[in-house]
Design a protein with these regions (language model features):
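Acidic catalytic patch
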Residues: 60-87
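Acidic, PIN/NYN-like endoribonuclease modules and their adjacent C-terminal/linker elements
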Residues: 98-125
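Acidic donor-binding loop at a coil-to-helix junction in glycosyltransferase catalytic cores
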Residues: 93
Length: 125
């Protein structure tokens, strides 16, 4: 688990309640050579902030920068890979994160146990 991609829920936990991330997951995040946060996470969390469903202490981009994480842009390849995924999960944000993790060879860090069914490497928090 050298290169990681954080699910949106993990980014929220790190902002609001770091204790929800297990010690094992924190150790893996701290020891990873690269930790990415997708642009889709910025989009998803911004929508939730705009609708009042989520309050964050800072912007997603500021949080990512302050934690020393890398931004993963959304590419056409990522978008096209979504069509190859089985309809296990209907959330378009999660489906794009799974596609990105597969295309980029990243371990997805998440609390969503349903994502394991896609076959991509998962680190549960």
């Amino acid at each position: 688990m050298d290169r990681l991609l954080l699910d949106s829920n993990v980014v929220v936990y790190l902002d609001q309640d770091p204790g929800r991330v297990t010690q094992h997951a924190r150790d893996q995040i701290d020891g990873a050579s690269e930790v990415y946060v997708s642009a889709v996470t910025g989009w998803e969390l911004s929508i939730k902030q705009a609708t009042g469903a989520l309050k964050m202490k800072t912007t997603v981009s500021s949080l990512v920068e302050s934690l020393g994480f890398l931004e993963l842009p959304i590419t056409m390849r990522h978008g096209e890979a979504v069509k190859m995924l089985p309809m296990i999960h209907r959330d378009p944000f999660d489906r794009l994160l799974v596609a990105q993790s597969i295309i980029e060879g990243l371990t997805l860090v998440t609390s969503d146990s349903r994502l394991v069914r896609y076959g991509t490497p998962i680190l549960q928090v």
